[in-house]
Amino acid sequence: MAGDVFGNGLLMSDKLQLVAAFNHLHIFIDPNPNPATSFVERKRLFELPRSAWTDYDTSIMSEGGGIFSRSAKSIAISPQMKERFDIQADKLTPTELLNALLKAPVDLLWNGGIGTYVKASTESHADVGDKANDALRVNGNELRCKVVGEGGNLGMTQLGRVEFGLNGGGSNTDFIDNAGGVDCSDHEVNIKILLNEVVQAGDMTDKQRNQLLASMTDEVGNLVLGNNYKQT
């Protein structure tokens, strides 16, 4: 979805229950999702040339959920949202809701985009250097998720990770969690640079280039896995 650079990580299983998500435009809430049905819909959106959370079929969402604009003055908190995310208020601003979602009792908090959303209680927002997210950022000791998965970089400060871990949370680091994707991108970019020169020279057609790229999938995958095994 728009702004969710590494959200494809949530296409790895049809058993996941995606209860909330957000990007720079919208907040997605599905308090009690059907894992299989919502997986199919996420996959449909992922395969569109361009997509936003507003393209999501809201008819399959559970009661009390919805897709809300981050520019709204306030958002009504349904009974289902209150129960799922342990929220007491009847209304919240979008920023207040995002702050509550980050602190919600869930199994997995997945960072799929850009921004630093978790710091340590000993750090100031100025220390973080991400002013756009100052109002919604939380401290590591406020997280109630069991695990943080970092598809994107710099989602937590290092001190924030330490504080989360000291309070019983599980996390690696961003450079470990997303190492496979970064390594895969490195291979992809270098191969495409090489092949583009061959195509421009007239020694290969675009169709032949695309067929060759597809045929290299398993080989590149094995190289990426090998590099990551050595790294971690």
Describe each region flagged by the PLM.
Residues 1-232:
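Non-transmembrane, aqueous-exposed alpha-helical and coiled segments at domain scale
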